[in-house]
Amino acid sequence: MDQKIQSLPAKKNIALVAHDGKKAALKLWCIKHLNALSEHTLYATGTTGHLINKTTGLDVIQLLSGPMGGDQQLGAKIAEHEIHMLVFFWDPLASQPHDPDVKALLRLAAVWNIPVACNEVSADMLLSSPLMNVELERTLPDYEKYLATRQIDI
């Protein structure tokens, strides 16, 4: 598939997600990085967003709870280029009833070329990157061009 270039703004839209067993770790990470996170627009699945807002005072756009469709809402926002970074503290040792939604979310992050942090260290590295607060370009699949050239025989 052909590629196109898209600019990401200096002020990023960051999605915050955590499985139940990792919510405390994400909360502490948000407290640790309160100042840096306040410079960006934050999105989160419902329970996680409520917890972060309540404990940090950060403004968080809260979607549905992950198992109730919040993971899919975030996936749609990634596909629509509204999310620029995903911080997802997932629990690799616990089975999740919405595992297919989680896999779809991570797949969309890979398709649309957004950085993903799955634990505190990777999230620290992304947030402290010199690219975090500057405009930057990324390559994306050129889906519109693909659709324009696609032929379907009926």
From Swiss-Prot:
UniProt EC number: 4.2.3.3
Protein name in the entry: Methylglyoxal synthase
Residues binding substrate: 19, 23, 45-48, 65-66, 98
Active site: 71
GO biological process, one term: methylglyoxal biosynthetic process
Recorded GO MF terms: methylglyoxal synthase activity
Family to which the UniProt record says this protein belongs: Belongs to the methylglyoxal synthase family.
Signal peptide residue numbers: none
